[in-house]
Amino acid sequence: MRRPGAASARPPLAVLLHGIGADETDLFALAPALDPRLLVVSARAPFEAEPMGYAWYAIDWYEHPPRPDVAQARASLERLLAFVGEAVEAYDADPSQVLLAGFSQGASMAVSAALARPEAFLGVAAHSGRLLHALLPASPPHGGPRVPVLWQHGRLDPVVPMAFGDEARRLLPPLGVDLDFREYAIGHEIGAESLRDLATWLSGRLGGAGA
């Protein structure tokens, strides 16, 4: 957990979600690049991955495209939403200023959370992810808030190909998402440019200038 640079009664909260085979320490390395007003926490996925780390859901790599374990994804989504609420309470964060940022599987979970509970998030950033079709809303929302989503994807990504990003660009706006889509000449990674864009976008959701 990284506390805000200056004392704040109820700081905004950013929750970071790692990809498969990693753990909560992976994305926490990005914390120094993020707005100092943010209280930053990094969540660990609930399932053990092979050969190392943790996963939000298992993947059948023998399918084409690789098929996610939907039951595990649903269970992880419930755990994630509960974790966010617990973190807000535990750290006395501002419940109206909660941001999610995820990479790969973490990106898929972040967007799934935004679609499941759009009123709970000030914004969601997804880097190198894919949509989990089984977790998409059955129908477009009628009224209510449009959740801001930053989707970042590498055109050279060999793990989660750009086609998944293009699909998200097509499907998310009709589902009540205010989408900011950006692509980069990188692979399955967070590059220097995409990290700067992520940090700037998160700061913009808070409003005003970073401390």
Predicted regions and their residues:
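Primarily recognizes the serine-hydrolase "nucleophile elbow" in alpha/beta-hydrolase
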Residues: 96-144
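C-terminal catalytic histidine-bearing segment of alpha/beta-hydrolase fold enzymes
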Residues: 163-211
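Serine-hydrolase catalytic machinery in alpha/beta-hydrolase-like enzymes
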Residues: 1-93, 97
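Alpha/beta-hydrolase-fold catalytic nucleophile elbow
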Residues: 44, 101, 125-128, 152, ...
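Short, conserved loop/helix-junction motifs that constitute active-site signature segments
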Residues: 32-35, 140-146
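Short beta-strand/loop motif that positions the catalytic acidic residue
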Residues: 151-153, 157
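Short, proline-enriched alpha-helix->beta-strand connector loops that line the catalytic pocket
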Residues: 144-149, 175-177
